[in-house]
Amino acid sequence: MALGSNTKFYETPNHPFQGERIADEANLIGRYGLKNKEELWRAQSELRGYRREARKLLGSAGEHETESEEFLARLKRYGILNEQDQLDDVLSLDVTDVLERRLQTVVYRKGYANTPEQARQFIVHGHIVLDDARVTRPGMTVETAVESSVGFDEHSSLSDELHPERAEAQE
């Protein structure tokens, strides 16, 4: 018997066709190199969960002080919030804040790839390591503490500075 969850990790939009929403989604997919809209909807659902949790904690005022601190610490650890941000700042987050913390985006922003799509390819093909461990999930959320350890695998052909794909970026 197969094990696993039959629930989706995202929620689809309520209305199937809204031109403005579709244009916004296409823009985000292109900017962050996402494979399909499901990845975008998953990030939106993750953000929706953060905001729901923040509203719950704000509504209960001082009752759940430790939960509030743990929640804020988690978001700060992932780099979604800055160190000085408070609980009500979670409500003003945007989906781009979540998408910026994906491994694919971090690899692209650090200059290891020329495009977000190329960053995705490098990750999926096993050329990228995180804390000396090969990671093949482009949608993985990168913590700020390990962000500096992102790099090419030493056994990868891309670790050579003169590799054609890396030489393109230097020109």
From Swiss-Prot:
Which GO cellular component does the record give, naming just one? small ribosomal subunit
Start and end residues of each stretch annotated as Disordered: 148-171
Q: Which SMART domains match?
A: Ribosomal_S4, S4
Q: Which residues form the S4 RNA-binding domain?
A: 101-165
Give the top-rank taxon of the lineage listed in the UniProt record for this protein: Archaea
PROSITE patterns, sorted: RIBOSOMAL_S4 (PS00632), S4 (PS50889)
InterPro entries per the record? Ribosomal_uS4, Ribosomal_uS4_arc, Ribosomal_uS4_CS, Ribosomal_uS4_euk/arc, Ribosomal_uS4_N, S4_RNA-bd, S4_RNA-bd_sf
Q: Which residues cross the membrane?
A: none
Give one GO biological process term. translation
- The biased composition feature labelled Basic and acidic residues covers 152-171
The record's listing under Pfam families reads: S4
One Gene Ontology molecular-function label: structural constituent of ribosome
Keyword list (alphabetical) reads: Ribonucleoprotein, Ribosomal protein, RNA-binding, rRNA-binding
Role description: One of the primary rRNA binding proteins, it binds directly to 16S rRNA where it nucleates assembly of the body of the 30S subunit. With S5 and S12 plays an important role in translational accuracy.
> Which PANTHER family does this one have?
30S 40S RIBOSOMAL PROTEIN, 40S RIBOSOMAL PROTEIN S9
> Which protein family is it in?
Belongs to the universal ribosomal protein uS4 family.
Instruction: Tell me how this protein assembles.
Output: Part of the 30S ribosomal subunit. Contacts protein S5. The interaction surface between S4 and S5 is involved in control of translational fidelity.
- Report the protein name in the record: Small ribosomal subunit protein uS4
Annotated gene = rps4
